[in-house]
């Protein structure tokens, strides 16, 4: 008989190498074939629900790591909640309208001019649906589970209809109106442009400093003082209605040769130099904060119009005077700040960039040519302090390469001011993981201007507005609901296929259209209105979902995006937030914290990670990040993640190998009969389980990642599994000591597999399929382990023992270095009490110390002589073990004997081998 044949070595078909890129798709195919998503829902039917509502990614382009981070985090949550017994459906969605898809088609060579709007929109739809299929495949490959066979898509007729109904309800409440707002306007192509259609080139422009006389000093400034503004667009001076100063900046009133000028103190030297002032003759007479200057009134330099001094945070000291010429009809910042002060929006420029009748004496002039006429008039009025020319980077039309302007054009708005307080109240009633999340969205809503919901594009949901012959707006409950019904039946393309009269209710009349003629709005809705309607189009529409959602989770850019538009439309129509809990994550950067870009060559994409390493590595990486802030990824970081994965996998494999002959139904030992060391590990498992469950509840995956490693390394690898080899391999198969350990080992394996399942979805499933006697067909259909109270006294006792064991290991290491021993089984350990710790008394309640220390012999005495080394938990002496090495277990013994032809066996091994003969 060979010694090896008498050992109970680990046996499992679970492979050491993961081979994830090849194995994961096979596991996913099995899930799909079994329809695991619906099985998991069926299991928890009738239970408490948990709804995480998916913010829709844009249906264009390949997935980036930000997509992966987002969807994997959501999957952690939904899978965990499902395993906790919640009915947790997850319906993924896609955002499908907007300019990028129009541009993508143009790049593909689709010529819009050769087809009708309806035909072009059909092409956009086809393209969006193709993109969804590609992204869907990639999301699923990451192990994300959801209703991918029936996702929500913003271009679906029922969704568009729900969006129109939200618009109608807001219109009903007086929250939708038409006004003017500045947008990028290209006189050369006579159209508005989106930011994506802008490119920057150098342009030579006039640079002027202009004095505005004080008209009403409000008892703050001198009545004969003047504000100095600086601008590079003289043609916008006719549209000036205000001067903006920063509330927190210091401003000075400077006397220069008898004239009193108000400018920012931080810019006084630069202004003095620009205006050729003699520095010796400049005198600072008074100082103010920008806040103190608010509501002082200045006089327009050549029009019979006041210019109000207002506060704005956009004012900087980078250039100019700190007093900003403000024309809400010709600037984004000007418009936003103007809204707060209810300033008029003046924009006397037509589509071609020519002054209209409203431009007075400049009527008929091209805006750029009017620059000279304006500066001449300012000179004539004595208001021009300096004219210069500069070359600077300026926005141009990407098609025509000609300069663009900001020009106020008619736009549709959703009123924020009327619902702002209601939204802020709803935010107060929403839960956040971190307080700064609440502060961020609260401040954004508090400070935002009115919401421009119209876009001058074609690929989107049309604004359901009609016009009578006299230009009157028709936007009634009847007309809007009729459009919603049409969209629900035919989709929104019907708007572009039918005449206005055929989109109105049958027999519709209006006093403004005596001839029965109507026109329809040509603008479409902002895509944020699309996705921001998902609470109605999805949560309230799908039977398995409910409103409001328990949770929204997106990137931190969505505080101004989807989080914002969703709460706006929801509060406006339902009076409550669409989410009870809000969570955000940061952006994915490279290993050094830099933004990923092709030019830097630091881009890592999900497809590459999955193909090279596997989805479980990507998922484990997500769990290793502090996702509330920006996160980092690199080849080196992924290598570290792979190393951690390998350690987890090998630990699970070791446990699988050592329970191959264990049946929990027949071989388990009751808890009270377990060896104390096994009860200690069982309680450590319970402690680890409680902490992991708590971390899942609080979405703290980094804690899970760290605690899993700690549990595996400290409790299992460094102690229990190492200690266990002498029992699992050497002891008799059915011995109490071996079954006691297997009972706990089986529990650790099953519970750890469940606890890891939401993160390492494929590996946990693979482990489960190799675990004997589990009841559920899939770990993902099992329940999370229950949190059980721990025996604290036992844990405290064994923690002290583990500290003492660390001291023994240090002593063994020293003996090894001094060549007293080689392997630890060659050691005899003597431990005694010292001034710091009463080791001899403490160790009386521990059995089989030699096994616990993985040495051959242990002796506990009251005192040792001076040759002993003093440690925190006792004096320790290491000597070479007495006797000879047992050929079977490698422990040293003075009582070696033989069984059959097997010699050099210790008494324990003799007994075991006899039972086998």
From Swiss-Prot:
InterPro entries: aa-tRNA-synth_I_CS, aa-tRNA-synth_Ia, Anticodon_Ile_BEm, Ile-tRNA-ligase, Ile-tRNA-ligase_type1, Ile-tRNA_ligase, M/V/L/I-tRNA-synth_anticd-bd, Rossmann-like_a/b/a_fold. ATP binds at residue 598. Binds 1 zinc ion per subunit. GO terms for cellular component: cytosol. The keyword Protein biosynthesis applies. Zn(2+) binds at residues 886, 889, 906, 909. L-isoleucyl-5'-AMP binds at residue 554. Its cofactor is Zn(2+). The keyword Calcium does not apply. A motif ('KMSKS' region) lies at residues 595-599. It catalyses: tRNA(Ile) + L-isoleucine + ATP = L-isoleucyl-tRNA(Ile) + AMP + diphosphate. A motif ('HIGH' region) lies at residues 57-67. It is an enzyme of class 6 (ligase). GO terms for molecular function: aminoacyl-tRNA deacylase activity; ATP binding; isoleucine-tRNA ligase activity; tRNA binding; zinc ion binding. GO terms for biological process: isoleucyl-tRNA aminoacylation. IleRS has two distinct active sites: one for aminoacylation and one for editing. The misactivated valine is translocated from the active site to the editing site, which sterically excludes the correctly activated isoleucine. The single editing site contains two valyl binding pockets, one specific for each substrate (Val-AMP or Val-tRNA(Ile)). Monomer. This is Isoleucine--tRNA ligase. It comes from Staphylococcus aureus (strain MSSA476).
């Amino acid at each position: 008989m060979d010694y090896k044949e008498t050992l109970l070595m680990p046996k499992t078909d679970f492979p050491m190498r993961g081979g994830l890129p090849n194995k994961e798709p096979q596991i996913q195919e099995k899930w799909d074939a079994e329809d695991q998503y619906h099985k998991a829902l069926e299991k928890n039917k009738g239970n408490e629900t948990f709804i995480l509502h998916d913010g829709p990614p844009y249906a264009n382009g390949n997935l980036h790591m930000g997509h992966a981070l987002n969807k994997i985090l959501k999957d952690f949550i939904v899978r965990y909640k499902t395993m906790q017994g919640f009915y947790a459906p997850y319906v993924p969605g896609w955002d499908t309208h907007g300019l990028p898809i129009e541009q993508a088609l143009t790049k593909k060579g689709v010529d819009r001019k050769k087809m009708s709007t309806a035909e072009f929109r059909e092409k956009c739809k086809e393209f969006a649906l193709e993109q969804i299929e590609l992204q869907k495949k990639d999301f699923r490959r990451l192990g994300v589970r959801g209703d991918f066979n029936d996702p929500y898509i913003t271009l679906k007729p029922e969704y568009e209809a729900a969006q129109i109904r939200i618009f109608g309800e807001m219109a009903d409440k007086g929250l939708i109106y038409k006004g003017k707002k500045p947008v990028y306007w290209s006189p050369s192509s006579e159209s508005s442009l989106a930011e994506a259609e802008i490119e920057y080139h150098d342009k030579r422009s006039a640079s002027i400093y202009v004095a505005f006389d004080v008209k009403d000093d409000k008892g703050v400034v001198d009545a004969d003082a003047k504000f100095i503004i600086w601008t590079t667009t003289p043609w916008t001076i006719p549209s000036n209605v205000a001067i903006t100063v920063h509330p927190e900046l210091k401003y000075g009133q400077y006397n220069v040769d008898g004239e009193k000028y108000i400018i920012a103190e931080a810019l006084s030297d630069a202004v003095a130099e620009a205006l050729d002032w003699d520095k010796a003759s400049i005198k600072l007479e008074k100082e103010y904060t920008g806040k103190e200057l608010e509501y002082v009134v200045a006089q327009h330099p050549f029009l019979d119009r006041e210019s109000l001094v207002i506060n704005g945070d956009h004012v900087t000291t980078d250039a100019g005077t700190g007093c900003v010429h403000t024309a809400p009809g010709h600037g984004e910042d000007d418009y936003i700040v103007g809204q707060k002060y209810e300033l008029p929006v003046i924009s006397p420029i037509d589509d071609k960039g020519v002054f209209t009748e409203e431009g007075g004496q400049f009527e008929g002039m091209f805006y750029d040519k009017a620059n000279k006429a304006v500066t001449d008039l300012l000179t004539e009025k004595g208001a021009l302090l300096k004219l210069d020319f500069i070359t600077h980077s300026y926005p141009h039309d990407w098609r025509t390469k000609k300069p663009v302007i900001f020009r106020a054009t008619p736009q549709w708005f959703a009123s924020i001011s009327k619902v702002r307080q209601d939204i802020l109240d709803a935010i107060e009633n929403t839960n956040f993981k971190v307080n700064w999340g609440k502060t961020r969205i609260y401040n954004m809503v508090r400070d935002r201007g009115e919401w421009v919901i119209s876009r001058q594009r074609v690929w989107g949901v049309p604004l359901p507005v009609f016009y009578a012959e006299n230009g009157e707006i028709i936007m009634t409950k009847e007309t809007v609901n009729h459009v919603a019904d049409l969209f629900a039946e035919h989709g929104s393309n019907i708007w572009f296929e039918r005449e206005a009269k055929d989109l109105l209710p049958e027999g519709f009349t209006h006093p403004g259209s005596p001839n029965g003629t109507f026109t329809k709005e040509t603008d479409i809705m902002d895509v944020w209105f699309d996705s921001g309607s998902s609470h109605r189009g999805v949560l309230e529409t799908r039977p398995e979902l409910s409103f409001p959602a328990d949770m929204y989770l997106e990137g931190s850019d969505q505080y101004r995006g989807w989080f914002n538009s969703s709460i706006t439309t929801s509060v406006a129509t339902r009076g409550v937030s669409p989410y009870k809990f809000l969570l955000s994550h940061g952006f994915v950067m490279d290993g050094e914290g830099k933004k990923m870009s092709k030019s830097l060559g630091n881009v890592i994409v999900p497809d590459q990670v999955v193909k090279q390493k596997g989805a479980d590595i990507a998922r484990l990486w997500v769990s290793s990040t502090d996702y509330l802030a920006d996160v980092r990824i690199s080849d080196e970081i992924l290598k570290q993640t792979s190393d951690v994965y390998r350690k987890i996998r090998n630990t699970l494999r070791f446990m699988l190998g050592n329970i191959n002959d264990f049946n929990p139904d027949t071989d388990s030992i009751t808890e009270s009969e377990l060896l104390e060391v096994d009860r200690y590990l069982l309680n450590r498992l319970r402690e680890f389980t409680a902490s992991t469950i708590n971390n899942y509840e609080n979405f703290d995956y980094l804690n899970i990642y760290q605690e899993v490693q700690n549990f595996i390394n400290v409790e299992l690898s460094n102690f229990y599994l190492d200690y266990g080899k002498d029992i699992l391999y050497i002891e008799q198969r059915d011995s109490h000591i071996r079954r006691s350990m297997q009972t706990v080992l089986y529990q650790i394996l099953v519970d750890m597999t469940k606890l890891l399942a939401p993160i390492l979805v494929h590996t946990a499933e693979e482990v489960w399929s190799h675990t004997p006697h589990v009841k559920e067909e899939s770990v993902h259909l099992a329940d999370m382990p229950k949190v059980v109270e721990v025996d604290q006294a036992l844990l405290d006792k064994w923690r002290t023992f583990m500290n003492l064991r660390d001291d023994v290991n240090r002593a063994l290491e020293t003996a090894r270095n001094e060549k007293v021993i080689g392997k630890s089984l060659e050691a005899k350990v003597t431990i005694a009490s010292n001034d710091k710790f009463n080791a001899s008394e403490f160790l009386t309640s521990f059995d089989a110390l030699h096994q616990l220390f993985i040495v051959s012999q242990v002796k506990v005495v009251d005192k040792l002589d001076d040759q002993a080394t003093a440690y925190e938990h006792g004096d320790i002496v290491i000597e070479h073990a007495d006797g000879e090495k047992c050929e079977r277990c490698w422990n040293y013994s003075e009582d070696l004997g033989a069984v059959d032809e097997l010699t050099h066996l210790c008494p324990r091994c003799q007994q075991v081998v006899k039972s086998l003969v």
